């Protein structure tokens, strides 16, 4: 009968500590790019939906990651990652 491999890897940081550190980093980055009132509203929505649970922490992490990714992708003034508008060969831009 097969056995699961032994966990011989390096000791990992507990998930909840890692998640809280990640959330703190995302919040610090988000306040640089979005109005605080929006972020407060997002936090209220998550709290009303999930309460004070790890599921809520995971949800807000996922949403903040998506918001920041899209924000950078469409052209954040603070970032060099954004899309640069490209012109077509005939000189018109896409609409």
UniProtKB/Swiss-Prot annotation:
HIV-1 lineages are divided in three main groups, M (for Major), O (for Outlier), and N (for New, or Non-M, Non-O). The vast majority of strains found worldwide belong to the group M. Group O seems to be endemic to and largely confined to Cameroon and neighboring countries in West Central Africa, where these viruses represent a small minority of HIV-1 strains. The group N is represented by a limited number of isolates from Cameroonian persons. The group M is further subdivided in 9 clades or subtypes (A to D, F to H, J and K). Residues 1-42 are annotated as: Homooligomerization. Homooligomer, may form homodimer. Interacts with p6-gag region of the Pr55 Gag precursor protein through a (Leu-X-X)4 motif near the C-terminus of the P6gag protein. Interacts with host UNG. May interact with host RAD23A/HHR23A. Interacts with host VPRBP/DCAF1, leading to hijack the CUL4A-RBX1-DDB1-DCAF1/VPRBP complex, mediating ubiquitination of host proteins such as TERT and ZGPAT and arrest of the cell cycle in G2 phase. The modification Phosphoserine is found at residues 79, 93, 95. Keywords: Activator, AIDS, Apoptosis, Cell cycle, Host G2/M cell cycle arrest by virus, Host nucleus, Host-virus interaction, Ion channel, Ion transport, Modulation of host cell cycle by virus, Phosphoprotein, Transcription, Transcription regulation, Transport, Viral penetration into host nucleus, Virion, Virus entry into host cell. It comes from the Viruses. This is Protein Vpr. Its main location: virion. Transmembrane segments: none annotated. One of its GO terms (cellular component) is host cell nucleus. GO terms for biological process: DNA-templated transcription; monoatomic ion transmembrane transport; protein homooligomerization; regulation of DNA-templated transcription; symbiont entry into host cell; symbiont-mediated activation of host apoptosis; symbiont-mediated arrest of host cell cycle during G2/M transition; viral penetration into host nucleus. It is found in: Virion; Host nucleus; Host extracellular space. Phosphorylated on several residues by host. These phosphorylations regulate VPR activity for the nuclear import of the HIV-1 pre-integration complex. During virus replication, may deplete host UNG protein, and incude G2-M cell cycle arrest. Acts by targeting specific host proteins for degradation by the 26S proteasome, through association with the cellular CUL4A-DDB1 E3 ligase complex by direct interaction with host VPRPB/DCAF-1. Cell cycle arrest reportedly occurs within hours of infection and is not blocked by antiviral agents, suggesting that it is initiated by the VPR carried into the virion. Additionally, VPR induces apoptosis in a cell cycle dependent manner suggesting that these two effects are mechanistically linked. During virus entry, plays a role in the transport of the viral pre-integration (PIC) complex to the host nucleus. This function is crucial for viral infection of non-dividing macrophages. May act directly at the nuclear pore complex, by binding nucleoporins phenylalanine-glycine (FG)-repeat regions. The lineage of its organism: Viruses, Riboviria, Pararnavirae, Artverviricota, Revtraviricetes. Gene3D superfamilies: 6.10.210.10, VpR/VpX protein, C-terminal domain. Belongs to the HIV-1 VPR protein family.
């Amino acid at each position: 009968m097969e056995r699961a491999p032994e966990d011989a890897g390096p000791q990992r940081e507990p998930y909840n500590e890692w998640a809280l550190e990640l959330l703190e980093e995302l919040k610090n980055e988000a306040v640089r790019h979005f109005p605080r009132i929006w972020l407060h509203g997002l936090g209220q929505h998550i709290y009303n939906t999930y309460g004070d649970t790890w599921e809520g922490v995971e949800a807000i992490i996922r949403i903040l990651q998506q918001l920041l990714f899209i924000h950078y992708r469409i052209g954040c003034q603070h970032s060099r990652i954004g899309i640069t508008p490209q012109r077509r060969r005939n000189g018109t831009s896409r609409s």
